[in-house]
Amino acid sequence: MATRSLIAIGSNIGNRVGNILKALSELSHVPGVTRITSTGFLYESPPMYVEDQPVFLNTCCEIETSLSPRNLMIALQNIEVSMGRERTFKNGPRIIDLDILFHGPHVVNDPDLIVPHPCISEREFVLAPLADICPSFVHPVLKKTIEDIRKSLNAYSTCHRVFPACGDRSLFRWGSRTFIMGILNVTPDSFSDGGLYNESVDAAVCHAIDLVAAGADIVDVGGESTRPKAEIVDELEEQRRVIDVIREIRLKFPNLPISVDTYRASTARLAIEAGASIVNDVSGGLLDPDMISTVSSLGVPYICMHAGRVGSHPPLMYGDQSGLLEDQSFSRNLKSSLDTVRDQLAGRVDACIASGVARWNIVIDPGFGFGKSADVNFALVRHLEDAISGVIKPYPVMVGVSRKRFVRDLVAGKEWCGSNEHAMLGTVAVAMAIQDRADIHRVHDVAQLKYALCVSDRVYRRHV
């Protein structure tokens, strides 16, 4: 009979993100481990006991296993050895550290093995990812839930949730500030910038350089327009447009987070191999059944968006329910619309977790535009917190309102509205969304947004 076991994972030497991913892969292939059912978010923290060493990355995972606690300990130690861990002194630096925290309800008190782990209650870097997975799990000895134990840890937090935007080379600390994704469309038919950067790789790379200089933290490369009624491009043409551009940007910027804007698993894989570090999927995995499993196998971040419609594709279906929120019934019942976005997006996140996508690699996007009426879009701006409540509340959020039609149409025909006002208004809408917890903003006009964020972050980000 399988037992639910919780494992702590840490690294502070070498490629820490890569080490943790490799350890998870090795663990999934251990005989007697049925599957890895969940992971926590990723946390960075200073060393706790021996301070003269590099900072740690930590997380936890939950597995189903038929192994006894002792045999599981032996398997974990074998993984550590195979990955090159050298035991020097207690609490010293290590390429990988794997510890059994809980093994179901079992209690073990042997000289070389104690389960539950005796130091759980004093380690925030263990309690934080544990609470991500199982906050209501009751410690079999302390008789308290994980969440209650964490709350009783009356210490100043030095444990920060982070996002491997470009592996270990570029870690975003969530909550420290708002991050900017600059848009690079290498398409002939995108609404506002189609045809500007698709004529040559050099033109696209030059624009990427401009985006970074203006303050972009991520450059998002897309090869197919997703505007309403846009022509569907075949995958070979999409790949022809984006792969060489991504490869050249990576040569220019070794540590820059680069995302590929695609709903195709084959394009995502080739883009990651060319140097992209994030997959940005406007369909949340609904337009290609292989997308989520591909992202899981690649071990890269995945931006999972809610959409009712993408380009000229038929409306997206979430089970037996459409994602379209365009007709007047939704405009009359905005709460129902927000609930629909929340529930359907939660279902896609569940699909990611079930397919083995690490929790720390998931970013959610409510999908401004994309089959939503203007009323629904403005409700999302105003009540973003409601649309990302419940089980998806802990996840970081990306929003994209830049040059969207619902903003543009608001001022269409106004005599004071010149050629650039729609961009300015989009920036204002983005800044408004920040207070309801947007972590990344996807925009065309990076410089304008950068200025707005200087003010907004000062108001809404308590760490700034």
Labelled PLM ranges:
Residues A2-P46, V50:
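N-terminal beta1-alpha1 ligand-phosphate binding loop
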Residues S5, I36, I180, I258, ...:
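Hydrophobic/aromatic residues located in beta-strands of well-ordered beta-sheets
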Residues R16-G18, L67-M73:
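Short, conserved charged micro-motifs
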Residues S38-T65, G223-V233, H313:
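Short, charge-patterned binding micro-sites
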Residues M48-F56, R70-M73, Q77-R169:
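Flexible, gly/pro- and Lys/Arg-enriched active-site loops
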Residues I149, S190-C206, T226-L251, L256-P257, ...:
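Active-site-adjacent loop and "lid" segments of alpha/beta metabolic enzymes
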Residues T158-F191, V357, G413, Y460-V464:
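N-terminal amphipathic alpha-helix/helix-capping segment at the start of soluble metabolic enzymes
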Residues C206-G222, A433:
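Catalytic domains of carbohydrate-active enzymes, especially glycoside hydrolases
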